[in-house]
């Protein structure tokens, strides 16, 4: 009988071979390269991988040689575009090397496999083990579910767009995919914010013994996280559309944020989208973590003497959870920084009147796809970070992935009982400590 490790190894090899075949198939189909989207509409230069933070920056096309306006069709119907002035043509084409495409495809497949296995295992651990169903772990489960949505939707679409570029999935999927992508990153960001706040609340009420089960406030937090994430993703579903144009005599269909929005709000959203994504989906979790971890540190220093005497073991567990949450936020910042950096650079450095602007766009397009891979890596690296930082999650992953005969509950039952006894003894000792202080002070 084959071991699980050998079966997983063979499955991984088969997936890598399939990825290589996908790369060759995408090149042989004759679709335009990834940079072709930049010349769409004749009046726009766009990077359009529909990622969690996919963006569109309006400007005049660098690849159009004609001064006549391009004909754009929406949903198969022709729509006239008013004549506009065009900047000088680029001195070179925007291109991505085939080597980068193959490397990107292999990395995406690896991230896809690791992310599916890691986040599914994490959700299974929290679902199967009652002792793991507490407030912080339920928020981590919400984070893992958001990451799983991102992996399933985002990585295959981005890989296909890099290799084939044409959008064959129809207008409905064109609106649904960016909506799900933006909702998933909203779940990730707000879950990290809630975890940071939860760690401060745990330290501020440090004498409270952590129980098993989901607190009502945590359940309310999770509902709010998902509702707010879905609401903030609605403009993506409204703004994205199928855009069809001619590219070197061939029809090219692309799913992108429509440059000609119908309402004033959507026009404002299109203009301010990059800064909105950077501020809310990147800076907000970092700022909240910095504020509440600073407050938590001050609280721990203020109560240091009593905590060391009475609740030493309890304090160690809460410090471990706080360290785990901080590690998750740090990984999030490192993984998402390249993607936001590439788009902020385009906003600040791009000059449509510069004939050398396409060299900058070639560099930013590669940096954009590197950032997309790094953002996807964040979705698969969270379970790995939990494995490395948290002893409890490490034991859970070993028990679940290695299929040990002894279940996690059996291995942890004695530890849980001992921990509860220690907590009760510490509570009793702390009460005596407070009583002695009260009588001595009186």
Curated annotation (Swiss-Prot):
Residues recorded with modification Phosphoserine: 305, 419, 440-442
Q: Does the keyword Phosphoprotein apply?
A: yes
Q: Which keywords appear in this protein's UniProt record, sorted alphabetically?
A: Cell membrane, Disulfide bond, G-protein coupled receptor, Glycoprotein, Lipoprotein, Membrane, Palmitate, Phosphoprotein, Receptor, Signal, Transducer, Transmembrane, Transmembrane helix
Instruction: Please give the GO cellular component terms listed in this UniProt entry.
Output: nuclear membrane; plasma membrane
The record's Gene3D superfamilies line, in alphabetical order, gives: Rhodopsin 7-helix transmembrane proteins
Q: Where is the composition biased (Polar residues)?
A: 50-65
Q: How does it sit in the membrane?
A: Multi-pass membrane protein
Covalently lipidated residues (S-palmitoyl cysteine) read 402-403, 405
Leader sequence range is 1-26
Q: Which residues are glycosylated?
A: 60
Q: Where is this region: Disordered?
A: 50-84
Where does the source fall among the domains of life?
Eukaryota
Molecular function terms, GO-annotated? endothelin receptor activity; peptide hormone binding; type 1 angiotensin receptor binding
Localisation per UniProt entry? Cell membrane
Its GO biological process annotations read:
aldosterone metabolic process; calcium ion transmembrane transport; calcium-mediated signaling; canonical Wnt signaling pathway; cellular response to lipopolysaccharide; cGMP-mediated signaling; chordate pharynx development; developmental pigmentation
PTM sites of type Phosphotyrosine = 439
Keyword Transmembrane (UniProt): yes
Q: Do you know which PROSITE patterns this protein is assigned to?
A: G_PROTEIN_RECEP_F1_1, G_PROTEIN_RECEP_F1_2
Chain ranges sitting on the Cytoplasmic side read 127-137, 198-218, 297-324, 390-442
Role description? Non-specific receptor for endothelin 1, 2, and 3. Mediates its action by association with G proteins that activate a phosphatidylinositol-calcium second messenger system. Essential component in the normal development of two neuronal crest-derived cell lineages.
Family the UniProt entry places it in: Belongs to the G-protein coupled receptor 1 family. Endothelin receptor subfamily. EDNRB sub-subfamily.
Under the heading PANTHER family, the entry gives: ENDOTHELIN RECEPTOR TYPE B, G_PROTEIN_RECEP_F1_2 DOMAIN-CONTAINING PROTEIN
Its recorded name reads Endothelin receptor type B
Which organism is the protein's source?
Answer: Mus musculus
Print the organism lineage.
Answer: Eukaryota, Metazoa, Chordata, Craniata, Vertebrata
